[in-house]
Amino acid sequence: MKFEWLFLTIAPCDAAEPWQLGFQDAATPMMQGIIDLHHDIFFFLILILVFVSRILVRALWHFHYKKNPIPQRIVHGTTIEILRTIFPSIIPMFIAIPSFALLYSMDEVVVDPAITIKAIGHQWYRTYEYSDYNSSDEQSLTFDSYTIPEDDLELGQSRLLEVDNRVVVPAKTHLRIIVTPADVPHSWAVPSLGVKCDAVPGRLNQISISVQREGVYYGQCSEICGTNHAFTPIVVEAVPSKDYGSRVFNQLIPQTTGEA
């Protein structure tokens, strides 16, 4: 039990956990930037909370009706007017600069990605297409990803988060994910990767990611898409670059060949 607790404290958190309050561990620079921005804004939030609380407590203490039935009237205070104008203007500036920097960096698209993957949302499963790989009949490598029913889960697998076919990607490689639906609006969201891209009918949205460490990352559809909206999870498995080719060709290609 002791070793299990130690493992849970040092192991990355890449899936939703019961009673979870914080973020999942970052696996991309984008998610790390989101976490850092949250901490920076939270610092200013604490400052404002302490300052406003002090003013309220001081006002309640010094202007109690029993001690001072006639409150002191301050007609004008130049210093107070200047301070309460300058500081509320400076704080949003310190928040806006890193916010816009992160926002624009999230919209940047890699010009020449190493791999392009197309994620197509359905009711209620997903189809993934590796556009860089073609089979013998010149068709792109394509496979479907369905939720594993609760009765078929193996020991250690997460309920409503595991799929039969994972998205296998190489770690520390620039990837482009193209997201689109086949029917109604969907969304492709993986918290550990800092990714949430809406799938809008008739449009192709794209995002660029670079997974910095090996692991298995879980996500879900973040757009209400119908009755089984909660049963369309996303599982991304990042493997070392040297193992990526064998994983794709040994696991995915036989599946597509069998379906054909």
From Swiss-Prot:
Catalysis performed (reactions): 4 Fe(II)-[cytochrome c] + O2 + 8 H(+)(in) = 4 Fe(III)-[cytochrome c] + 2 H2O + 4 H(+)(out)
Classification via Gene3D superfamilies: 1.10.287.90, Cupredoxins - blue copper proteins
Domain of life (superkingdom): Eukaryota
Record GO cellular component, one term: mitochondrial inner membrane
Cofactor descriptive note: Binds a dinuclear copper A center per subunit.
Top class in the EC scheme: translocase
Subcellular localization: Mitochondrion inner membrane
InterPro entries to which the protein is assigned, alphabetical: CcO_II, CcO_II-like_C, CcO_II_C, Cupredoxin, Cyt_c_oxidase_su2, Cyt_c_oxidase_su2_TM_dom, Cyt_c_oxidase_su2_TM_sf
GO biological process: ATP synthesis coupled electron transport
Chain segments annotated as transmembrane: 40-61, 77-104
Residues annotated for Cu cation A2 binding in this entry: 221, 223, 225, 229
Sites where the protein binds Cu cation A1: 186, 221, 225
Alphabetically ordered keywords of this record: Copper, Electron transport, Magnesium, Membrane, Metal-binding, Mitochondrion, Mitochondrion inner membrane, Respiratory chain, Translocase, Transmembrane, Transmembrane helix, Transport
Annotated residues for binding of Mg(2+): 223
Single GO molecular function: cytochrome-c oxidase activity
Residue intervals on the Mitochondrial matrix side: 62-76
EC number: 7.1.1.9
Quaternary data: Component of the cytochrome c oxidase (complex IV, CIV), a multisubunit enzyme composed of a catalytic core of 3 subunits and several supernumerary subunits. The complex exists as a monomer or a dimer and forms supercomplexes (SCs) in the inner mitochondrial membrane with ubiquinol-cytochrome c oxidoreductase (cytochrome b-c1 complex, complex III, CIII).
Protein family membership: Belongs to the cytochrome c oxidase subunit 2 family.
Function noted in UniProt: Component of the cytochrome c oxidase, the last enzyme in the mitochondrial electron transport chain which drives oxidative phosphorylation. The respiratory chain contains 3 multisubunit complexes succinate dehydrogenase (complex II, CII), ubiquinol-cytochrome c oxidoreductase (cytochrome b-c1 complex, complex III, CIII) and cytochrome c oxidase (complex IV, CIV), that cooperate to transfer electrons derived from NADH and succinate to molecular oxygen, creating an electrochemical gradient over the inner membrane that drives transmembrane transport and the ATP synthase.
Additional remarks: The gene coding for this protein is probably silent. Soybean nuclear genome encode an active cox2.
Entry protein name: Cytochrome c oxidase subunit 2
Source organism (scientific name): Glycine max
